[in-house]
Curated annotation (Swiss-Prot):
Role of this protein: The enzymes which catalyze the reversible phosphorolysis of pyrimidine nucleosides are involved in the degradation of these compounds and in their utilization as carbon and energy sources, or in the rescue of pyrimidine bases for nucleotide synthesis.
Name of the featured protein: Thymidine phosphorylase
Record family assignment: Belongs to the thymidine/pyrimidine-nucleoside phosphorylase family.
InterPro entries, A to Z: Glycosyl_Trfase_fam3, Glycosyl_Trfase_fam3_N_dom, Glycosyl_Trfase_fam3_N_dom_sf, Nuc_phospho_transferase, PYNP-like_C_sf, PYNP_C, Pyrmidine_PPas_bac/euk, Pyrmidine_PPase_CS
Organism for this UniProt entry: Shewanella sp. (strain MR-7)
Length: 443
């Protein structure tokens, strides 16, 4: 028998907790046997004294097991269950293409995604822009779409990792969100509850990233790769660039449009293509669906070129309640803003740097993101045709096009966009889209 206060005292004094102590405490979070004050105290003790890798694995698996753990064996799937998770960014629409692409190559992708908060967009918010699409289907429908289509992208259900829900809300109110150990457990408990065979983790770096520095992003990526592999899920973490908007746009309906254009081949932003292919190829390799990276990329390009990935996206949308002709006629269904107008820079030169976080917040100000949980969104607003770093900018080249519902909202966003994108006489040095891969062998 353990006492919560003794577990807190032990971590406060900088000692390692046993697996049994961690399991006891996490069970108490779920059953309310542990008070809010005790959870806050342990969170702060971990924040200051950290956890070793064994503790992190124990915390992650205990939180994973605090609710329902999905089981795919009864469905008789004839391929690996694989997924991707991102720490979030601006214009990060990768999931919408990657899920169908991986499914078209023989994987099964039960992707449980989140909503946007702060400056980052949420995958679920993008799907909410599609009329009829159920982001919270019954577990039966979720399983059916995964089996029949190969991919389903939905929101977290109430019975998945309840311990994380309670722990996270308390961390949010007590300034312990930034702990690498606790971030690792929070992210991975949700993913591992999906009983994945393999996971590709996208950890963002730069001005639009969740972590403030490259070093912090790398530390988180290493922690996630080590804990996930330690918990039995083959995982690679990629460090990818978020020093500029990833797609050519940021918002909800506008990102859905870009995803469909990508899948159908109408337009593929080169940076978005590079990161999507890097993550998706890694999923195929980890899942045993490709022999090497060249084979994985060839398979992915094939399902893009022959239309199979776009077809699967359409089947997922209709399977979860959306229009059956959405891919072919998306412009008929996606909402559009009252005002769609370009923004021009005050000076000429090259797009030199971007405060990506501020561009994300400009979308929030337009009504496309949340200031607080529960805020209603306007799915039509956002930015399109956002310039890329290194683009030559003159008086006739817009740095972005703003989609707004009022002149006031447009003016506010215009000011923010001009401030966030710096124009210089000199072109910036080109940075890679993917900085590093952290695989099990690298740990």
């Amino acid at each position: 028998m353990f006492l919560a206060q003794e577990i807190i005292r032990k971590k406060r004094n900088g000692l390692a907790l046993s697996t049994e102590e961690i399991q006891f405490f996490v069970k108490g979070i779920t059953t309310n046997a542990v008070s809010e004050g005790q959870i806050a105290a342990l969170g702060m003790a971990v924040y200051f004294n950290d956890m070793n890798m064994d503790e992190r694995i124990a915390l992650t698996t205990a939180m994973r097991d605090s609710g329902t753990v999905l089981n795919w064996q009864s469905l008789g799937l004839n391929g690996p269950v694989i997924d991707k998770h991102s720490t979030g960014g601006v214009g990060d629409v990768i999931s919408l293409m990657l899920g169908p692409m991986a499914a078209a190559c023989g994987g099964y992708v039960p992707m449980i995604s989140g909503r946007g908060l702060g400056h980052t967009g949420g995958t679920l918010d993008k799907f909410d822009a599609i009329p009829g699409y159920q982001t919270e289907p019954s577990s039966e429908l979720f399983r059916k779409v995964v089996k029949d289509v190969g991919v389903a992208i939905i929101g977290q259900t109430g019975d998945l990792v309840p311990a994380d829900k309670r722990f996270y809300s308390i961390r949010d109110n007590t300034a312990t969100v930034e702990s690498i150990s606790l971030i690792t457990a929070s992210i991975l408990s949700k993913k591992l509850a999906c009983s994945l065979d393999a996971l590709a983790m996208d950890v963002k770096v730069g001005s639009g990233a969740f972590m403030p520095t490259y070093e912090a992003s790398e530390e988180l990526a290493r922690s996630i790769a080590a804990v996930a592999n330690g918990a039995g899920t083959k995982t690679t973490a990629l460090l990818t660039d978020m020093n500029q908007v990833l797609a050519s746009c940021a918002g909800n309906a506008v990102e859905v449009k870009e995803a469909i254009d990508f899948l159908t081949g109408a337009y593929r932003n080169p940076r978005l293509y590079a990161v999507t292919m890097g993550l998706c190829a890694e999923m195929l390799l980890l899942g045993g669906l490709a022999t090497d990276e060249a084979d994985a990329r060839a398979k992915l390009n094939r399902v893009l070129d022959n239309g199979r990935a776009a077809e699967i996206f359409g089947k997922m949308v209709s399977g979860l309640g959306g229009p059956v002709d959405f891919v072919e006629n998306y412009s008929k269904y996606l909402p559009q803003s009252q005002i769609i107008r370009p923004v021009f820079a005050d000076t000429q030169g090259y797009a030199h740097s971007m405060d990506t976080r501020e561009l994300g917040l400009a979308v929030v100000t337009l009504g496309g993101g949340r200031r607080k949980p529960g805020d209603a969104l306007d799915y039509s607003v956002g930015l399109t045709q956002v310039c890329a770093l290194g683009d030559k900018i003159d008086a006739s080249t817009p740095i972005a096009v703003i989609h707004a519902q009022s002149e006031d909202a447009f003016a506010q966003a215009e000011e923010a966009v001009k401030k966030a994108i710096r124009i210089d006489e000199v072109a910036p040095e080109k940075t890679p889209e993917i900085y590093a891969y952290i695989r099990a062998a690298d740990l």
